[in-house]
Amino acid sequence: MRRREFLTGLGATAAVLKTGLAQTTAGAPDAVQAELDRQVATGLVAGCVCTTVGGRTWFGGRMRFDPPVPMRPDALFDLASAAKTFTAGLCALLYAEGRLDPDAPFTDYLPEHVLAQERHGITVRDLATHTGGFDNAKPYIVADPVEFNRRLYAKRPVRPRGVAYDYACSNMIYLGRIVEHITGLDLESAAIKMLWRPLGMEETYWHNIPGNARAVEAMQNGHPPIGFKGDEQARAYPAAMGNGAAFSCAADMLRFVDDLRTRRTFPKAYYDLLSTPCFEKGAVRRSFGWDMGAAHRPAGWSARTMTHGGFTGVTIGVDPGSGRAGVVLTNRLGERLAGYEGHRRLLALMSR
């Protein structure tokens, strides 16, 4: 069933979605479940799984449409850009090990780039904060990997570094390539060895998962086949890339963000790099790979809050200041910004 067909029949099925598919681990309705049910019933999302510290999980709606499959708490979602935080985390681990200098020119680690032959000043940190001057143009999206790389490394900034925040997927692709150059591992292998395994994240994947019964049907990015990455850049290249498009479940993502709250697994330098604001201008406030701006902060969370979203309908967040952390995973149907606002409402309600 396509998105339009689903929305057409939504009014007739809203009552079923509210009473038959929406559940909590406690089995009782509450404010979080009521908000989740509302988002499903109004067509903002097809389904949702959300969880917070303490392990309680809420879920409801549908994970697939034809035939309809109810959402399950261990469903695997395409994280889209929320997986950029894995790339940032790997860089932070390399920094903590003394193998990566965030304030070095990024071309020190990526000599293939055209700027390596020029005086440019763009640092690794600039890439992580999206302030190096690159825009979000994607001239490198072609089917041939060799040509993909040639165009990727030929991309030039459109403005001087540090002038403005401009979210660009290529920034994180470059950081992913830097991780691979330093470690000698492909990005997924590096994530498994350095980040996911130490955190106990056993159900997170940076490759397609066709045939997996837990894979959610994503309704964005051209409605890709179930279990396949939706991002056009990820589809164009045969290996994991730093701009995101990994698959994971709510339990694994809570392990990831909750560790940023408790700071128990990795060296102090890892947490400090990721949680310290390093670009502030106007309403923009960025740390290394994370958004710390007030506009994306759930109600009641402190100024230390770190969040990241994903186009498919995902938000992950942690507030080391108040001890909050949470994950909202949806297969979004409605408008993107309305989806993010819905995520913030759920995170605020879960943390009361």
Language model region names:
Residues 315-316, 323-332:
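Short, well-ordered beta-strand elements
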Residues 295-299, 335-352:
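Short, gly/Ser/Thr-rich active-site loops of penicillin-recognizing serine hydrolases
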Residues 28-77:
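Short, conserved catalytic-motif segment at the N-terminal edge
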Residues 5-23:
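N-terminal export signals
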Residues 42-47, 67-126, 159-170, 241-244, ...:
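Short active-site loop at a secondary-structure junction
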Residues 46, 57, 62, 116-306:
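Short, surface-exposed loop or secondary-structure junction motifs
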Residues 307-315:
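Low-complexity, glycine/alanine/valine/leucine- and proline-rich hydrophobic stretches
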